[in-house]
């Protein structure tokens, strides 16, 4: 019987220390929930991509403190280890991948500010109560809005620097939504988001909540009904 992917992560973890140990430990926790029974010979790029491009942007609040580089360095070390010891081919991540993860983290932070997300940190949980009050007041105005949409969307166009054109997955509906210029400057065509939208009495659309934001390179996983 082949070794399990998670047992190989634990095997590799014994060789790590310091920051790399912390990063690989996070990768083990992630993998034990999603790839618990997967054998090492079934490992592929998506195991790494889901961790780097779907899990990390939800957890890392400061993309400029070097943490993302540490995660990518640790994952590259692990990828090299399984290439050399188990003949499993997983691509090495590059500076482009680092910049893309940072971009997504930056977009998440901009949306938190734009939508009055009161959560400053998830671990430990820290909430800004002034922002919480603003968010609560905003949501009490829902009675004045005529229509809502929620689900996965792909970003199709950036319009005039303050609107984006979204296409709802599975239905194909196009919606033009107002955004902050700081957000418009960071997003790219092809990005994927899971969001709640509402239409105001003047028939323009706006964001209510952003639940998830992903780079286009995980679109195939979203289409396969992978949720994180």
Which sequence ranges carry the predicted segments?
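N-terminal DNA-binding module of tyrosine recombinases/phage integrases
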Residues: 1-9
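Non-catalytic DNA-binding core/recognition domains of DNA-processing enzymes
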Residues: 12-84
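Charged, alpha-helical interface segments at or near domain boundaries
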Residues: 57-58, 62-134
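Structural detector for short beta-strands of small beta-barrel domains
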Residues: 121-124, 131-161
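Short nucleic-acid-contacting surface segments enriched for D/E, G, S/T with interspersed K/R
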Residues: 145-149, 179-196
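OB-fold (S1/OB) nucleic-acid-binding surfaces
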Residues: 155-176
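Extended accessory and catalytic-adjacent subdomains in large enzymes
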Residues: 163, 172, 179-186, 202-214
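OB-fold/S1-family single-stranded nucleic acid-binding modules
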Residues: 198-228
């Amino acid at each position: 019987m082949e070794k399990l992917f998670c047992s190989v992560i634990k095997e590799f973890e014994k060789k790590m220390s310091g920051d790399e140990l912390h990063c690989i430990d996070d990768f083990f926790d992630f993998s034990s929930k999603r790839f618990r029974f997967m054998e090492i010979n079934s490992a592929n790029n998506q195991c790494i991509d889901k961790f780097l491009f779907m899990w990390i942007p939800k957890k890392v609040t400061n993309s400029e403190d070097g943490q993302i580089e540490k995660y990518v360095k640790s994952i590259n070390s692990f990828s090299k280890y399984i290439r050399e010891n188990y003949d499993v081919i997983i691509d090495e991540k590059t500076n482009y991948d680092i910049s893309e993860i940072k971009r997504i983290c930056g977009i998440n932070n901009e949306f938190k500010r734009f939508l009055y997300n009161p959560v400053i940190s998830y671990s430990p949980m820290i909430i800004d109560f002034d922002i919480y009050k603003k968010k609560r007041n905003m949501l009490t105005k829902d009675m004045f809005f005529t229509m809502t949409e929620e689900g996965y969307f792909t970003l199709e166009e950036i319009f005039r620097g303050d609107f984006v054109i979204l296409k709802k997955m599975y239905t194909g509906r196009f919606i033009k939504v107002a955004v902050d210029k700081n957000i418009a400057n960071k997003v790219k065509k092809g990005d994927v988001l899971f969001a709640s939208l509402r239409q105001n009495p003047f028939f323009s659309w706006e964001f209510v909540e952003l639940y998830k934001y992903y780079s286009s390179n995980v679109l195939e996983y979203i289409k396969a009904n992978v949720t994180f």
